[in-house]
Regions:
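Short beta-strand-to-turn element immediately C-terminal to the catalytic PLP-Schiff-base lysine
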Residues: 180-181, 194-199, 248
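PLP-dependent aminotransferase class I/II
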Residues: 34-38, 43-47, 110, 122-126, ...
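Conserved active-site segment immediately N-terminal to the catalytic lysine
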Residues: 151-189, 219-220, 226-231
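A short alpha/beta connector and helix-capping loop motif
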Residues: 106-113, 164-177, 370-383
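Phosphate-binding glycine-rich loop
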Residues: 26-73, 86-91, 97-98, 164
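PLP-dependent aminotransferase-like
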Residues: 64-160
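Structural detector of well-ordered beta-strand residues that form the stable sheet scaffold
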Residues: 50, 75, 96, 149-150, ...
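N-terminal "arm"/small-domain region of PLP-dependent enzymes with the aminotransferase-like
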Residues: 1-27, 229-231, 363
Length: 384
């Protein structure tokens, strides 16, 4: 079976973990943590970034930094992973779900403003498949209503946004805060692992304190105070040094990994764009390809197809499985989930529901190249 995902190892992970063990610094914020954070700040222009134990923890740190609580509202897309909403629910805030665009799964910025109330505090755009949301539109709305923006960039490492001002900015640098994931399904991995990016100076000091279990320990180790203690809320968000060592082995090869993933993504694009292939998909089997807006770049996190309905998608997945190729659907709508549907305000979110029924993801990982022709042959057969 050709899997949907296979974690790629560069070959240096075990060596760097051994180095971390030999250094005797295991609990985090050691040499490898600093290397990773410095590399990411310099490469992408984050004002400050902090490694976390997961992308979920990065979101939970961001939620704490926004200061939301009971009575506050946070606008979140329904077509996303549960962590996007959970982080704010755990603070006591109410999540207000917004629909996706009709031409791509990202948040529909034109639907945000009508959902803003005096209780709204935060907007959380999710860059689906590593493709940028319309950040100029979102930031304009946020600035007009004095709201915070937290970018959920879990899938968006090494992806960029071209603003109306002509500036090219890394995703995760545009909102007040940004969150990334290094889960094993992502482009760059650490098993688990995540990253919080802080782009607003107001949040830098408090982010370090929350990261260090509510203490000013980071200031103590920089020699800024002569002792450290409990000064705020926080938790154990700092990952072990072994996680940072693993991540550093990946970051050293970031350009190589990205180049390979983009080659594989482009192979898919050219195959499905070919008129002969498109002509073989008849009637209800017709598909749509991913849309990359002019303001977005493609980081090759995911290649997906959109089928006309659930039945045709299910048929395609079954036919691919019969040929030993694993293709998978993605999110179930959060607004109609078992946990939240009674709390939702009842608004229909038709685009979100459509993507939940029709989107299918194809295998895409470093090392797929020897098997990609088999995947494409299976696709041709499944669409015949």
């Amino acid at each position: 079976m050709i899997p949907f995902n296979r974690p790629y190892l560069t070959g240096r992970e075990a060596e760097y973990i051994r180095q971390a063990l030999a250094a005797g610094k295991l609990s985090g914020n050691g040499e490898f943590t600093k290397r990773c954070q410095n590399f990411l700040e310099e490469r992408y222009g984050f004002r400050k970034c902090l490694l976390t134990t997961s992308g979920t923890d990065a979101l939970e740190m961001a939620a704490l930094l926004t200061g939301v609580g009971p009575g506050d509202e946070v606008i979140v897309p329904s077509y996303t992973f549960v962590s996007t909403a959970l982080a704010f629910l755990r603070c006591g805030a109410r999540v207000v779900f917004v629909d996706s665009r009709d031409d791509e799964p990202n948040i529909d910025a034109t639907k945000i403003e009508s959902l803003i109330t005096p209780h709204t505090k935060v907007i959380v755009p999710v860059h689906y498949a590593g493709c940028a949301c319309d950040m100029d539109a979102i930031m304009e709305i946020a600035n007009r209503h004095k709201l915070l923006v937290v970018e959920d960039a879990a899938q968006a490492i090494d992806s960029f946004y071209m603003g109306r001002d002509g500036k090219r900015r890394a995703l995760g640098t545009i909102g007040h805060l940004g969150c990334f994931s290094f889960h094993e399904t992502k482009n760059i991995i650490a098993g688990e692992g995540g990253l919080l990016t802080i782009n607003d100076e107001r949040f830098v000091r408090r982010a370090e304190i929350i990261w260090e279990k509510g203490t000013n320990r980071a200031e103590f180790f920089r020699g800024e105070v002569n002792k450290y203690g409990w000064v705020d809320i926080g938790s154990s968000f700092l990952p072990a040094e072994s996680v940072a060592a693993f991540l550093w082995a990946q970051l050293e090869h970031l350009d190589e990994i990205q180049a390979e993933r983009k080659r594989l993504w482009q192979n898919y694009w050219e195959f499905f764009s070919d008129r002969t292939v498109a002509a073989s998909a008849t009637g209800a089997d017709k598909y749509c390809l991913p849309r990359i807006p002019d303001y977005a770049t493609n980081n090759a996190h995911m290649f997906y197809l959109l089928f006309p309905d659930l039945a045709n998608r299910s048929d395609f997945i079954a036919k691919m499985k019969a040929q030993d190729v694993s293709c998978v659907f993605h999110y179930l709508p959060l607004h109609s989930s078992e946990y939240y549907r009674a709390k939702h305000d009842g608004r229909a979110l038709p685009n979100c529901d459509r993507y939940a029924d029709t989107l299918v993801r194809l295998p895409l990982y470093y090392g797929l190249e020897p098997d990609q022709d088999k995947v494409l042959a299976a696709v041709k057969s499944a669409l015949a």
